Every structure is written in structure tokens, then in C-alpha cells.
Amino acid sequence: MKVRASVKKICRNCKIIRRKNIIRVICSNDPKHKQRQG
């Protein structure tokens, strides 16, 4: 899980999801692409 100021999709399988005002990126293809804004 990377914590970044700006989250972006890294590959085409990445999905941007908003949970409790936290923006996250979830990737089914590569777990290294998981990110959270903070």
C-alpha cells in the first residue's frame, strides 16, 4: 500500500474507489498498485 498525495491509475486494471472520504486505488492484476491518498 502506497500513501500518496495524488493517486493515479497505473495500469488499466486499476480502479479508483472512495471509502469514507479516503480515495483508494485497487488493482486486481498487480497488488503493488494499491494506493491511498493521505
Curated annotation (Swiss-Prot):
One of its GO terms (biological process) is translation. SUPFAM superfamilies: Ribosomal protein L36. The keyword ATP-binding does not apply. PANTHER family: 50S RIBOSOMAL PROTEIN L36, CHLOROPLASTIC, LARGE RIBOSOMAL SUBUNIT PROTEIN BL36C. This is Large ribosomal subunit protein bL36. It comes from Buchnera aphidicola subsp. Cinara cedri (strain Cc). PROSITE patterns: RIBOSOMAL_L36. Keywords: Ribonucleoprotein, Ribosomal protein. Belongs to the bacterial ribosomal protein bL36 family. GO terms for molecular function: structural constituent of ribosome. GO terms for cellular component: cytoplasm; ribonucleoprotein complex; ribosome. Transmembrane segments: none annotated.
